[in-house]
Regions:
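N-terminal secretory signal peptides that target proteins for export/translocation
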Residues: 1-12
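Bacterial N-terminal signal peptides
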Residues: 19-30
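Glycan-recognition and catalytic cores of secretory/periplasmic carbohydrate-active enzymes
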Residues: 31-38, 116, 150-541
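Electrostatic cytochrome c docking/interface patches
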Residues: 37-59, 176-180
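Thioredoxin-like thiol-disulfide oxidoreductase module
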Residues: 49-52, 85-131
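Local sequence-structure signature of Cys/Sec-based thiol-disulfide redox active-site neighborhoods
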Residues: 49-83
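Catalytic cores of eukaryotic secretory-pathway lumenal/extracellular enzymes that build
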Residues: 69, 99-101, 266, 393
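Non-catalytic, surface beta->alpha helical segment in thiol-disulfide oxidoreductase systems
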Residues: 116, 122-156
Length: 541
C-alpha cells in the first residue's frame, strides 16, 4: 500500500506555495536537441518516449525539468540554481535528470499535466509520480527539496505537491440535441458571470487575453449576450493595453501574474498577438475606438516585421522575455540588443497564427500581409507534401524539420488549410487539407472511442486538450463538405457525440479556476457544435 505524506516542512511549504510567482504560464526523422542545457553542470538525459524505461536500471529517482527557451524564469532557474555546484553534484549523484523542452515535447507536458514553466516533476525509481510543482526555487531551497525527495521516494509513494485540475469524463452514449443546445448556453453564461467587475479580465487571479474565447463571446449567443460581452471585453482590452502592451514596438505580453494586471510575463507569442489583433479590429468594428485601432495596427506591424522572416518566407513564433528591455523608451532601446526571436518554427503555432491573420486581412486588405500569409502557407505545404510525415518544428539555422508531428500539429494544419481554401477560393489548399486529414485518421483516430487520440496522452488523458483538437478536426471535416466521404461524415458525428456532455464539468471548472486558458479549449469544440448543428438542421430542412 502506497504511503502518502507531506514532502516539506512548513517553511518549505511557504516557499513552494509562492513559487508559482516564478512560473511562465501550457521514415527517419531527425531528432532535435532542446536548447541550452548541453553545457549545464547537471548531467541531463535528452528526453525521448522511452527514456524512463531505458534508465531504470540505475535505481535512481527522476528529476524531470520542463523548460522553454522563451521563458525568463526558466533561464533564471538554470542560471541561479542549477549552476550551484552542490545542487548539480547532488542531482548527478542521486537522480536521473531529464530535460524536456515543452515546445518540442508538448505532448509530454500535457501527459504530466504540467502548469506553466519551469515545471518540475519527481518520479519514483519505478517511474511513478512522486511530486511535482511549478516555478523557480533558488539554490539552497531547491537543494533541501531534492534531498528530501531522494530520502523519501519509493515504489508507489507520493507526496503532496501541486494539485493539477483533472476533469473526469464519461463520454455521451448517444447524440442529444438538447445537450448540443444547452452546452454553449451554459458556457457563455458561466464565462460572462466570471468577468472581474473591478479589474476586468476573466477571474480574480492572473490576467491574460484569451482571443478564441473573447471572439466567441462577441459572435455567439443572443443579442443581449453579445452586448454584455462587448461591455466586458471593451474594458478588458483597455486594461490590457494599459498593462501588458508594448506601445513602442507593438505586441502584447503573455499574461500578468496578479488580478490588477501587474507583473507581466514579457514573452511575445505570434498566435496570441495575431488573435489579439483580430479581436481589436472586431471590437472596433462594433464600437469604434481609436485606441484599439492604434494598438491593433502597431501590433500587426510588429508581427509583419519583427516576427516575419523574409528569407524563410514565414512567421516566427516567439520573442523571448526580457524584464529590463521593455522599460526602456524608444531611444534607449536603439542602444541595446532587443530580446531574441527564437529560430525554431512550430507547425501548430504557425498554423494558429496564420488562421488568425487570414481573417485579419479581411479588415486591413493589406497586400504585404497577404503575401506573407501565402508564403507561410507555402512553407508549411512544402513540408507536408515533400516530407514523409508531418514534422513538429523547423530549425532555421539548420534549415531542417525535426521530430514527428503530434495530433496538435495535424489538427491545426488541417484546420488552417481548410480556412485558406475558403478564403482564397483555392481548391489546391483543400487538397493539402485532405492529405493531412487522411494521415490524421490513419495515425490518430481510435475506432473504439470514435475520437482522435494522442498516444502520449491517451484517450483518458487531458480531456479538454483532446476535445479542442478533435473540435479543430471536426470543423475542418465539416468544411470539406462534399469532398468528405461517408466514413468522414461518421467521424464528425462520433466526435461531436463523444464530447457533448462536457458541459456538465463547467460548473466545477468555473468555481475554482485560476488560469482561464481552459476556456480556449472549450470554444474550439463549441464552434464545431455550431457548424455541425447548422449543417444538420439545414439538411433536415
Amino acid at each position: 500500500m502506497s504511503k502518502s505524506f507531506s514532502l516539506i516542512s512548513n517553511r518549505r511549504k511557504d516557499i513552494v506555495r509562492w513559487v508559482a510567482l516564478g512560473v511562465c504560464l501550457t521514415g527517419l526523422v531527425p531528432v532535435g536537441l532542446a536548447y541550452e542545457h548541453n553545457a549545464s553542470l547537471v548531467h541531463f538525459e535528452e528526453y525521448s518516449d522511452n527514456v524512463i524505461a531505458q534508465t531504470q536500471e540505475s535505481g535512481k529517482p527522476y528529476f524531470l525539468l520542463f523548460s522553454a527557451e522563451w521563458c525568463h524564469w526558466c533561464h533564471e532557474f538554470s542560471q541561479q540554481t542549477l549552476t550551484q555546484k552542490d545542487v548539480a553534484d547532488y542531482l548527478n549523484q542521486h537522480f536521473t535528470n531529464v530535460f524536456i523542452d515543452v515546445d518540442i515535447h508538448d505532448t509530454t507536458y500535457v501527459k504530466y499535466r504540467a502548469l506553466g514553466v519551469p515545471f518540475t516533476v519527481f518520479l519514483n525509481p519505478d517511474g511513478s509520480l512522486y511530486y511535482k510543482y511549478g516555478g523557480t526555487l533558488y539554490g539552497d531551497d531547491f537543494l533541501d527539496v531534492i534531498k528530501e525527495v531522494s530520502a523519501s521516494v519509493g515504489p508507489g509513494k507520493t507526496a503532496f505537491g501541486i494539485e493539477t485540475r483533472v476533469v473526469s469524463y464519461e463520454p455521451s452514449p448517444g447524440l442529444s440535441i438538447d445537450n448540443l443546445l444547452n452546452f454553449p448556453v451554459a458556457f457563455r453564461r458561466g464565462v460572462l458571470d466570471n468577468f472581474d467587475s473591478e479589474e476586468y479580465g476573466l477571474g480574480r487571479e492572473q490576467k491574460s487575453i484569451l482571443p478564441r474565447t473573447f471572439l466567441y463571446l462577441l459572435e455567439s449567443g443572443t443579442d443581449d449576450d453579445q452586448k454584455e460581452a462587448l461591455g466586458w471585453l471593451t474594458k478588458t482590452m483597455e486594461r490590457a493595453i494599459e498593462t501588458i502592451y508594448d506601445p513602442v514596438e507593438g505586441g502584447f505580453f503573455r499574461y500578468a501574474e496578479t488580478r490588477d494586471w501587474r507583473v507581466p510575463h514579457y514573452e511575445k507569442f505570434s498566435d496570441l498577438n495575431a488573435g489579439t489583433v483580430l479581436l481589436l479590429y472586431r471590437l472596433n468594428e462594433i464600437k469604434p475606438s481609436p485606441r484599439f485601432i492604434e494598438a491593433a495596427d502597431t501590433t500587426l506591424r510588429y508581427l509583419t516585421s519583427t516576427l516575419y522572416d523574409s528569407d524563410l518566407g514565414c512567421f516566427l513564433n516567439f520573442q523571448v522575455a526580457d524584464t529590463n528591455y521593455y522599460f526602456l523608451n524608444e531611444k534607449r532601446r536603439k542602444a541595446v540588443n532587443p530580446p531574441k526571436v527564437m529560430d525554431k518554427i512550430f507547425s501548430d503555432r504557425l498554423a494558429a497564427t496564420l488562421n488568425y491573420l487570414i481573417e485579419v486581412n479581411e479588415y486591413v486588405n493589406d497586400p504585404k500581409l497577404e503575401e506573407q500569409v501565402i508564403r507561410s502557407l507555402g512553407f508549411l505545404e512544402q513540408m507536408i507534401l515533400q516530407g514523409q510525415e508531418i514534422r513538429r518544428y523547423f530549425s532555421a539555422p539548420e534549415h531542417l524539420w525535426y521530430e514527428p508531428g503530434g495530433l496538435s500539429d495535424y489538427a491545426h494544419l488541417v484546420h488552417l488549410f481548410i480556412r485558406a481554401a475558403s478564403h482564397f477560393e483555392n481548391l489546391h489548399y483543400a487538397d493539402v487539407a485532405s492529405t493531412v486529414l487522411h494521415a490524421s485518421i490513419l495515425k490518430f483516430y481510435d475506432k473504439n472511442s470514435g475520437v482522435f487520440v494522442e498516444p502520449a496522452v491517451g484517450s483518458n488523458g487531458n480531456v479538454e486538450y483532446l476535445m479542442a483538437l478533435n473540435g479543430l478536426l471536426a470543423q475542418a471535416m465539416i468544411g470539406l463538405g462534399d469532398r468528405l466521404d461517408e466514413k468522414g461524415q461518421s467521424i464528425i458525428e462520433r466526435v461531436i457525440t463523444y464530447y457533448s456532455l462536457m458541459g456538465e464539468a463547467l460548473e466545477d471548472r468555473f468555481w475554482d479556476a485560476v488560469d482561464w486558458h481552459f476556456t480556449e479549449n472549450y470554444v474550439v469544440y463549441l464552434a464545431a457544435i455550431d457548424q455541425f448543428a447548422a449543417t444538420e438542421f439545414s439538411s433536415r430542412d
